[in-house]
Amino acid sequence: MAENKQVDTEINGEDFTKDVTADGPGSENGDAGAAGSTNGSSDNQSAASGQRDDDRKLFVGGLSWETTEKELRDHFGKYGEIESINVKTDPQTGRSRGFAFIVFTNTEAIDKVSAADEHIINSKKVDPKKAKARHGKIFVGGLTTEISDEEIKTYFGQFGNIVEVEMPFDKQKSQRKGFCFITFDSEQVVTDLLKTPKQKIAGKEVDVKRATPKPENQMMGGMRGGPRGGMRGGRGGYGGRGGYNNQWDGQGSYGGYGGGYGGYGAGGYGDYYAGGYYNGYDYGYDGYGYGGGFEGNGYGGGGGGNMGGGRGGPRGGGGPKGGGGFNGGKQRGGGGRQQRHQPY
């Protein structure tokens, strides 16, 4: 019996939580949104709506570049009714990246796929795994000292399972700052919460916003000679062991939630960049990154190709001379020194 594994719905800087949906707007392979969006039954759509997409989503890695949506549907359709399929392609070349996402109409199909000994498509063994839901994070502003930590947790706990609560502390004033971050186990919880941007806790009105990562142009600043280096380097540039590890900006501040969040002092929270993500999303899928120059199956390995600047400098930067990672480390100054704060 095959091992029932789960993998994050994020790969090498991209979020795939929302691009496989019943109405199919996120498709990158042209006809996946139309052909794979429904299976012709409104009753099945209604039944599936009672279950989160994440619970019914399958990641399929190790695909041949020639594998089509139809071939995936023919193979996995025998395990259960398929709601949608999205074969991921490179946006520049249109070439398959060697993996896809499939959403079934029920969770039982995922169990059946996992229970099978092996899966062969186009004479090639593929690697299907249950996709794990992406966490969602909110920013809560306008908190007064009268609102206790426990009241905050209790209030937001009614909307979904809380994974983490971050409450920055003002050392000078010896009190909690007027904002916090709350992470839920599902992005859907955040989507639902944002329908009511103004909430009341203990009779006090607070602002609720989606916590967003630092803009890419700021994130990439470390590649142009940032003080502590943007890229961790190691051995792989992008993918592999090196990875793009910007959880800490090297200055001891949190990375990615700069910008202030409208007067709540969140700018003091620095550059908080949650979870070591690149563009907000982490490296999941046990090596199914496509940073290896789209060679082989388009996943696995480290560095090389379009997004992996060589083998990585020994103490930082992604390129051969610690140069920033892209295109063999030709950018100026990237990363040279190891970050002072290591990500956890």
From Swiss-Prot:
Residues 56-138, 136-213 form the RRM domain. The keyword Amino-acid biosynthesis does not apply. One of its GO terms (cellular component) is polytene chromosome puff. One of its GO terms (molecular function) is mRNA 3'-UTR binding. It comes from Drosophila melanogaster. The lineage of its organism: Eukaryota, Metazoa, Ecdysozoa, Arthropoda, Hexapoda. It is found in: Nucleus; Cytoplasm. Component of ribonucleosomes. Could be needed to organize a concentration gradient of a dorsalizing morphogen (Dm) originating in the germinal vesicle. At least one of the isoforms is essential in somatic tissues. Interacts with grk mRNA (via 3' UTR) and involved in its localization to the dorsal anterior region of the oocyte during dorsal-ventral axis determination; may function as a ribonuclear protein complex together with otu and Hrb27C. Required for polytene chromosome dispersal in nurse cells during oogenesis; nuclear isoforms play a greater role in this than cytoplasmic isoforms. InterPro entries: Nucleotide-bd_a/b_plait_sf (IPR012677), RBD_domain_sf (IPR035979), RRM_dom (IPR000504). Residues 36-49 have a biased composition (Polar residues). Residues 215-254 are annotated as: M9-like motif. Gene3D superfamilies: 3.30.70.330. Residues 222-238, 301-337 have a biased composition (Gly residues). It comes from the Eukaryota. Interacts with bru1/Bruno; the interaction is direct but weak, and may play a role in regulation of grk mRNA localization and translation. PROSITE patterns: RRM. This is RNA-binding protein squid. Keywords: Cytoplasm, Nucleus, Phosphoprotein, Repeat, Ribonucleoprotein, RNA-binding. Possesses 2 putative nuclear-localization domains, a M9 motif found only in isoform B (sqdS) and a M9-like motif found in all isoforms described. These may mediate interaction with Tnpo/Transportin and Transportin-dependent nuclear localization.
